């Protein structure tokens, strides 16, 4: 899951599916209840190649800043960015990369990441993006699974790539160039004003990106995203007369989330390129540097994950900076509780704060707050908005698989041209995720309220089963994070001979606070039903999370063994 939001129980109380009434389970199969966006569908030019679509407005923004490297201040206009991307395309082609070939981009956020991804698109190559902090073993698995022929990386990661393949081409973006590697300048030495004249027939169903799922609930699998699926997803967000996410060409969009993750790649980079906005690249998070960049470059859009939202809401350093330029704060990857949202709103009263929901396989965005629309519609606290345009969403019963109506929690399913084509070389996993009618089953539990707003309760596989009762960890985590003495928290199941599983919490204390285990237990017990009460609390220095901000529950469960 890339983006998610947690419902606020005091605002909405969905029907408990443990008791199913006759109107939920009729004697004859009902017509499926399908939910759609409150915004009208739009025409989407998803017959185009991705790069053509993203740079379609090039002539009108050619002299505008496209990329700004936060650490150096170096800026590239749209005209310069497009030209370098074409030179990279030419360089890759000269190195033997052809349509359908896979290249691996192993970089932190940088201009070279953008040049490489878009350059690969121009020749019909496929980019598989990888986490630079992966181990050699993890990189080998992704390299082998994807079949990548070339890796573009930074010299500091080269040692991890030794012995991964004799015929593997390594290109590094910095100087000096390590032994047996080619400098990035090799790709951009084509000094023609109109480089790469080859004609490549790229269809909408051809693969453009090959991200790998996080593996927190299973083995990583290559997710085939086509030119059509990526264009559809971007258009669902930023195209049309009243876009769901209203970006303007004078917007400056903070890119601190890693581009190797689909959330940042899609909702930050591709959305920005399509809109003619400026992308401010930050290669790693550090609160002081982030605040300085927001102030110095007058950032207007900040796409974040909850840990960064917590920093903005709770870190006293924030008060020393002028953040008045920010108009949208997008949050995803995990829930935001109401108190945390209120804290951030006090810090950024002029900004609209909203959440979205998605997953890599869905292209990735399923829903988004309509508060970000050109003609905004207020969204409830805890909601992750309505389903995106040109898509269909339904909620199915966890056992009967029948379609459910309003306020009835079940598994979220999505259908539309934005979803993945398949899992790479894994037809069994593909058919288990996308059914014969084209519905992608997310594995997320949620419901749609009477205003068509979506509330995610939890991951299906992460639900704790206490004597048959379902205990959603995200609900308890939201309560914990809203406590003034708690900086971060995660809840996981611990095996129990009597109950089967019991919820236990890992808690990070706020600076200077000495909250005890009993304090935490009592705080939660006052707010939840008996079977959701915490049985143990462990205090830790930090909560392990993936680059996208998802809690690595398997690491915490391992501590309980």
Swiss-Prot record:
PROSITE patterns: AMP_BINDING. Residues 286-355 are annotated as: SBD1. Keywords: ATP-binding, Ligase, Magnesium, Nucleotide-binding, Phenylpropanoid metabolism. Its cofactor is Mg(2+). Residues 356-423 are annotated as: SBD2. One of its GO terms (molecular function) is ATP binding. CoA binds at residues 284, 467-468. Induction: By UV irradiation. Its EC number is 6.2.1.12, 6.2.1.34. (E)-4-coumaroyl-AMP binds at residues 263, 267, 333, 355-356, 360, 368, 461, 465. Preferentially expressed in leaves, flowers and siliques. One of its GO terms (biological process) is pollen exine formation. Pathway: Phytoalexin biosynthesis; 3,4',5-trihydroxystilbene biosynthesis; 3,4',5-trihydroxystilbene from trans-4-coumarate: step 1/2. CDD domains: 4CL. ATP binds at residues 213-217, 221, 355-356, 360, 444, 459, 550. It is an enzyme of class 6 (ligase). Belongs to the ATP-dependent AMP-binding enzyme family. Both substrate-binding domains (SBD1 and SBD2) are involved in the substrate recognition, and are sufficient to confer the substrate specificity. Produces CoA thioesters of a variety of hydroxy- and methoxy-substituted cinnamic acids, which are used to synthesize several phenylpropanoid-derived compounds, including anthocyanins, flavonoids, isoflavonoids, coumarins, lignin, suberin and wall-bound phenolics. Follows a two-step reaction mechanism, wherein the carboxylate substrate first undergoes adenylation by ATP, followed by a thioesterification in the presence of CoA to yield the final CoA thioesters. This is 4-coumarate--CoA ligase 3. It comes from Arabidopsis thaliana.
């Amino acid at each position: 899951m890339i983006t998610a939001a947690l419902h606020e129980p005091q605002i909405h109380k969905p029907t408990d599916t443990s008791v199913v009434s006759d109107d939920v389970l009729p004697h004859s199969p009902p017509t499926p209840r399908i939910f759609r966006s409150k915004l009208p569908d739009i025409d989407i030019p998803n017959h185009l190649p991705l790069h053509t679509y993203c740079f379609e407005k090039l002539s009108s923004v050619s002299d505008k800043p496209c990329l700004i490297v936060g650490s150096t201040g170096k800026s590239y206009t749209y005209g310069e960015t497009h030209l370098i991307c074409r030179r990279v395309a030419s360089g890759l082609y000269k190195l033997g990369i052809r349509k359908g070939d896979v290249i691996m981009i192993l970089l932190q956020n940088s201009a070279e990441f953008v040049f490489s991804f878009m350059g690969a698109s121009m020749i019909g190559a496929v980019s598989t993006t990888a986490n630079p902090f992966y181990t050699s073993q993890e990189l080998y698995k992704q390299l082998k699974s994807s079949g990548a022929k070339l890796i573009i990386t930074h010299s500091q990661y080269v040692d991890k790539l030794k012995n991964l393949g004799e015929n593997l081409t390594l290109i590094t973006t910095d100087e000096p160039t390590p032994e047996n590697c080619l400098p990035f300048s090799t790709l951009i030495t084509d000094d023609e004003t109109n480089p790469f004249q080859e004609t490549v027939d790229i269809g909408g169903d051809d693969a453009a990106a090959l991200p790998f799922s996080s593996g927190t609930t299973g083995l990583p699998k290559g997710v085939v995203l086509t030119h059509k699926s990526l264009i559809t997803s971007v258009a669902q967000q930023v195209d049309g007369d009243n876009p769901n996410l209203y970006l303007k060409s004078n917007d400056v969009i903070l890119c601190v989330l890693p581009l190797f993750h689909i959330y940042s790649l899609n909702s930050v980079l591709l959305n920005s390129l399509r809109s003619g906005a400026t992308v401010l690249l930050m290669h790693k998070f550090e609160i002081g540097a982030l605040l300085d960049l927001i102030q110095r470059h007058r950032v207007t859009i900040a796409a974040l994950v909850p840990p960064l939202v917590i920093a903005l809401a709770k870190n006293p350093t924030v008060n020393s900076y002028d953040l008045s330029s920010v108009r949208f704060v997008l949050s995803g990857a995990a829930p935001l509780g109401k108190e945390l949202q209120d804290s951030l709103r006090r810090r950024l009263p002029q900004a609209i704060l909203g959440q979205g929901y998605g997953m890599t396989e869905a292209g990735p965005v399923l829903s988004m707050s309509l508060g970000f629309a050109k003609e905004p519609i207020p969204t409830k606290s805890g909601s992750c908005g309505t389903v995106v345009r040109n898509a269909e969403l339904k909620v199915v019963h966890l056992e009967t698989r029948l379609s459910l109506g309003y306020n009835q929690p079940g598994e979220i399913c999505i259908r539309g041209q934005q979803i993945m084509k398949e899992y790479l070389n894994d037809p069994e996993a593909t058919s288990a995720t996308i059914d014969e009618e084209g519905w992608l089953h997310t594995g997320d539990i949620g419901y749609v309220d009477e205003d068509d707003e979506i509330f995610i309760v939890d991951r299906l596989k992460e639900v704790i089963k206490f004597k048959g009762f379902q205990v959603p960890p995200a609900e308890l985590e939201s309560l914990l994070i809203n406590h003034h003495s708690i900086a971060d928290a995660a809840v996981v199941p611990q095996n129990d001979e009597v109950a089967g599983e019991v919820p236990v919490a890992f808690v990070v204390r706020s600076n200077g606070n000495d909250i005890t285990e009993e304090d935490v237990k009592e705080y939660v017990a006052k707010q939840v039903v008996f079977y959701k009460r915490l049985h143990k609390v462990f205090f830790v220095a930090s909560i392990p999370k993936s680059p996208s901000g998802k809690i690595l529950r398997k690491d915490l469960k391992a501590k309980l063994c």
